[in-house]
Regions:
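Cleft-lining beta-strand/loop regions that shape enzyme active-site pockets
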Residues: 36-39, 47-48, 64, 93-270, ...
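PDZ/PDZ-like peptide-tail recognition elements
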Residues: 91-110, 396-446, 450, 534-539
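PDZ-domain C-terminal substructure recognizer with occasional recognition of PDZ-binding tails
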Residues: 66-90, 388-412, 474-529
Length: 737
């Protein structure tokens, strides 16, 4: 994307699509970018009364066959129509500018001591501010540009010049309307009880009072504008106060006021639309009206139609009036429609699904810069697949394949056609991948364990007649993951899931190499994490405490510290998922007196001029401990199962106390789980926040790194040993010595 500044406009080019797009695809991608930008920022979409999904579906049929600018223009017109945006302009036309020299005189005297001030954007700025002569009894300001302002002058400089003149024409402070922008932050967290960060809404910027200049006089004032530049906010305030009258001359396009943004569908096909609003102090939005409208006439100076119209307005006393204003905007929460009635959506709706997934991640996925693959190319590939999919399952698989490219272990894709309501049972096993082979790390189903059919250290070589390496590779290709270890972990878990009532035949190899086959019955899944071993959740042995954070509950934290208070060291086992104990734990460990332990980043989509592509940063705070601090040595066990809340807990402990991490890198996927719902009730989950260490180091796709690397071995599994825990104990013995 290329951004070119145009004063109050931002031009967003789409050239980066072209290299990957095939014939006919560039126009679809250009329309997708327009749909995405409007969806994220246009003020008309705040109230939820416009079906923006359906608007894209209505526009897409214009784009059949080869790329064609007329078709693309027609698609853009159809797409933007529901917005009823008075600022909308589609297509470039050669602008007609006022005919006045770049270095022409600023002041021209008209009859009746009327000062015509040529403040045309595009004129060379004078070294000193213009001082209105005492002779002036009436004033006309001609603010129409004489040149394209994209590259000529700074909008800020133009405002300074205008304000210096207006300050000489007011006798009390003037309050211009303030710019107000809509911003969006993407879908809400999957768990409605979670902290959401900043929710979508409006951001109103400050405005600045215009103060009278020394010796200012309240003179009759008329202002000439046209359709080439937005009407300045200060002029609108003067009109509202009855202190100015406005003449506009315009052609097919109407004059406008308020923030604008421009997105270029092609080099010569811009779409310009509202970037926000101007708001009065009561919250209502400006809807400006000229005191007189004229047909397009770019002439200026004495005898020109616009100047004559301004003189006619000055001949009669202006009335104080209040131009029409729109009611204050009232943004409403908008959740994605599920479209459950279209299990296998028609082609246009399938295209919408791919575009919506792309747009959501393009705007709101905070770790997009860390992806290995081009997200634009992922969209192209998915759009091509949408042409050929034959049923709801193939449709879901196409979206799943696209989402995999996000490289985020939180990412998952689910729908009925993909079997999310069918795989309700699983084999009660913990698996480990060692040197490319899959081994039983533990049997968690008591019935299966009692049967003796499987033992820790057994190699699984086949499942239901399929070679396990083949099955695992196939499943791994469907897994989005922050790290390769995380990809294999997710694939191995998926490998143990089955529908209810199934019988599963496993081919096994024991330590002696003897092959055997066993048949097992998957059991109903629940949310309980399997026990790693028979150790108590909290124990102390020879001065070293052990705490299983999978089992520790929030209400048990203080009692746990009371139990271990006399230990010289503690091993926290975080090779699983905690129960919301992170802050309570870190507070009692905070010998470093840390005030915060992590920073979370949330994407903020808003118009370019208001801060396009901004990120919000939040510090996770640590508060004073409710009890005595634990000052012993701290070790934490981690591995690829340490994900999300578990990683957050690790960051909290890391900030609070000198901790030694033992094990293998964590999953590298932290940040609350969010979801986008696509046509056909397809859900895609992803990390809604990017979380970093307190010192700013990356966590996403990196994970918490162990100080001491330790991993299970095949021999250790077969001997029933927990080698990671053993390594931690060994470290503490060495440290004691």
């Amino acid at each position: 994307m290329v951004v070119r500044s145009r004063g109050v406009c931002a031009a967003l080019a789409l050239w980066w699509f072209s290299s990957a797009a095939q014939a006919g695809e560039h126009d679809v991608l250009a329309l997708a970018r327009l749909w995405s930008e409007v969806r994220a920022t246009h003020p008309a979409l705040a109230a939820g009364t416009i079906d923006w999904d359906r608007a894209l579906v209505a526009a897409l049929p214009h784009l059949e066959g080869e790329d064609n600018q007329n078709s693309l223009r027609a698609a853009a017109v159809t797409l933007m129509a529901p917005l009823h945006d008075d600022a909308l302009r589609i297509g470039a036309s050669m602008p007609a500018f006022v005919r006045w020299p770049v270095d022409g005189a600023v002041l021209e005297w008209l009859p009746g001591d009327t000062a015509l001030l040529h403040l045309h954007p595009g004129m060379r700025a004078a070294a000193a501010p213009f001082v209105l002569p005492v002779r002036a009894r009436r004033v006309i300001l001609d603010l129409r540009p004489i040149a394209d302002m994209s590259y000529m002058s700074s909008p800020a400089m133009l405002q300074v010049s205008l304000h210096s003149v207006l300050a000489q024409l007011i006798v009390r402070p003037l309050l211009p309307p303030a710019p107000r922008y809509r911003f969006s932050t993407g879908p809400r967290p999957q768990d409605g009880g979670q902290w959401e960060g900043v929710v979508p809404g409006f951001m109103q910027m400050e405005t600045q009072s215009l103060l009278p200049a020394p010796g200012a006089r309240c003179l009759p004032l008329a202002v000439i504008v046209n359709d080439a530049q937005p009407v300045p906010a200060a002029v609108l305030a003067l009109q509202r106060a009855g202190r100015a009258q406005i003449v506009t001359e315009e052609g097919v396009r109407r004059s406008r006021a308020g923030p604008l943004q421009t997105l270029w569908l092609e080099d010569d096909l811009p779409v310009e639309f509202s970037a926000g609003q101007l708001a009065w102090p009561d919250g209502s939005a400006v809807r400006w009206q000229a005191d007189q409208r004229l047909p397009q006439d770019r002439a200026t100076g004495q005898g020109s139609a616009p100047v004559m119209a301004a003189l006619a307005l000055l001949a009669r006393k202006p009335k104080r009036h209040k131009p029409a204003a729109s009611p204050a905007m009232y943004p409403l929460r908008q959740d994605d429609a599920a479209y459950r009635d279209m299990r296998f959506p028609p082609r246009a709706w399938r295209m919408l699904a791919a575009i919506k997934l792309w747009a959501t991640m393009d705007k709101y996925f905070p770790a997009r810069r860390l992806m290995d693959h081009s997200w634009e190319e992922a969209l192209l590939a998915c759009l091509r697949r949408m042409e050929d999919v034959r049923d709801a399952r193939e449709y879901g698989l196409a979206l799943e394949a696209m989402a995999v490219q996000l490289d985020d272990s939180h990412v998952g894709t689910g729908s009925r056609a993909l079997g999310w309501n069918e795989r309700t049972h699983g084999i009660g096993l913990r698996l480990a991948r060692i040197d490319g082979r899959v081994y039983v790390a533990g049997v968690t189903d008591p019935v299966l364990e009692g049967s003796g059919l499987l033992r820790a250290g057994d190699e699984i070589t086949g499942i239901d007649g399929e070679d396990v390496s083949t099955r695992l590779a196939r499943l791994a290709g469907k897994m989005a993951a922050s790290t390769e270890a995380g990809r294999w972990r997710k694939a191995m878990f998926e490998m143990t899931l089955f529908s209810g009532g199934a019988s599963v035949r496993l081919r096994l190899a024991a330590a002696d190499g003897v092959q055997r086959s066993v048949t097992v019955q998957p059991t109903s899944l629940d949310n309980a994490l399997p026990l790693r071993h028979a150790l108590p959740a909290v124990s102390v042995d020879e001065g070293v405490a052990y705490v299983d954070l999978d089992r520790l509950q929030p209400g048990e934290v203080d009692a746990m510290f009371a139990t271990i208070k006399d230990s010289r060291a503690v091993i926290f086992d975080m090779r699983g998922y905690p129960n919301g104990t992170g802050r309570a734990l870190a507070r009692r460990l905070n010998v470093r007196h840390a005030a915060s332990f992590a920073t979370s980043y949330q994407q903020l989509a808003m118009p370019y001029e208001a801060g396009h592509g901004a990120q919000l940063a939040y510090e996770d705070r640590l508060f004073p401990a409710p009890g005595p601090l634990y000052r012993g040595k701290v070790v934490m066990l981690i591995d690829e199962h340490t994900q999300s809340q578990a990683e957050h807990l690790a960051l909290a402990v890391e900030a609070a106390t000198p901790v030694t991490f033992v094990g293998t890198p964590s999953a590298g996927a932290n940040g609350d789980l969010r979801e986008v719902v696509l046509p056909g009730n397809v859900h895609v989950w992803y990390s809604g926040l990017e979380v970093r260490h307190a010192d700013g180091r990356e966590l996403q796709r990196v994970g918490v790194q162990p100080h001491i690397l330790a991993a299970p071995t095949v021999a250790g599994l077969r001997a029933g040993r927990d080698e990671v825990l053993e390594r931690a104990r060994q470290f503490l013995r060495q440290d004691q010595g």
